[in-house]
């Protein structure tokens, strides 16, 4: 058959067929992502979600997951638009997405919209503003300086205790423990059992992780009840004798009617769960990068002033939380996708942070990246993470200690990432140090 000359009707039709095939392929990819829960919840995507995020972004910014009421939002602009529309998208955590044995996604129901357990990051204004104001009083510059002294001393003790024959299991010895020690000090707990608090705090987030077996769910529920009982006991003690700490501040706020007791107690549970979890994940990811990328480790050692840029790039590259949920108040649209009332968004920080429309070469770890704090790992706007400054402080102290006490760190054994669609934390990181 004679080939049609360039520009002839035959050539135009041939070009149109190729375009239609490409569009059809893209649509098929979109439908696969949207309908197959295994794609989103599977082990491959849990351990390395970024190739999936890239395919999702290429097909669209908003994806319905497995015919459920959950929509994943993966584009930078769409995520930011959702954050900026609180009148349409509530921060209340009314349900989380879970993976079933049948390979489908279903909701794990939480408190309904406007319920009393929505605090801090999961509260809407005006309640959110009240919660934030109470906590921020204890995260002011003066208090941060006191916490800095405590953190330096605590990190030193954990380092000495964790080092054995030139090795340290970083997550168990330092990353999981230090943030919980800092949270306990901030709240004002007397003689806390840190190992127990870590167990309880992680149990609280395990309920939300989406990949939990029934027996794990039951155990996590029991642990959360134990943590709640402990918090209630400490709160009663503080109410009888308020001290100059967050616990005393909350007790005083309840006595004055500014806050109800249940809300104050849930706020403390949330600080343990989210505050400990997020900083532990940051400390784990940062040291994993240093230990597995000797080129980056050498740059930071040779140029100590790069430590701040390293921390920010770590936050962009591996956000401590994969994302956060939003509740769709009324039927609306986001980036052209129709969203029914009472459906849910999962705003994927990790996907937004690697959107090539926002970041040059987003899959590369760069210490010279412009606009270092331009990532969205700590949220944005009214819900910008209340503990961001404290988390950065802990990271700076711990990483400075690690680099000052060693000449080389290597990863002797790296465990997998926590099976979770909410948290991005390495489970085990054995370091060999010189």
UniProtKB/Swiss-Prot annotation:
- Top enzyme class, one word, equals oxidoreductase
**Alphabetical list of PROSITE patterns matching this protein:** CYTOCHROME_P450
Q: Which residues bind heme per the record?
A: 132, 326, 383, 385
Knockout or disruption consequences: Cells are more sensitive to azole inhibition.
GO terms, molecular function = cholest-4-en-3-one 26-monooxygenase activity; heme binding; iron ion binding; steroid hydroxylase activity
* GO annotations of cellular component type: peptidoglycan-based cell wall
The EC code for this enzyme is 1.14.-.-
Q: Give the record's free-text account of how this protein's activity is regulated.
A: Inhibited by azole drugs.
Supply the alphabetized keyword list: Heme, Iron, Metal-binding, Monooxygenase, Oxidoreductase
Positions contributing to substrate binding:
124, 128
Q: Does the keyword Heme apply?
A: yes
For activity, the cofactor(s) needed are: heme
GO biological process terms, alphabetically, are: cholesterol catabolic process
Q: How does it assemble?
A: Monomer.
Q: Which family does it belong to?
A: Belongs to the cytochrome P450 family.
| Protein's recorded name | Cytochrome P450 144
What is the gene name?
cyp144
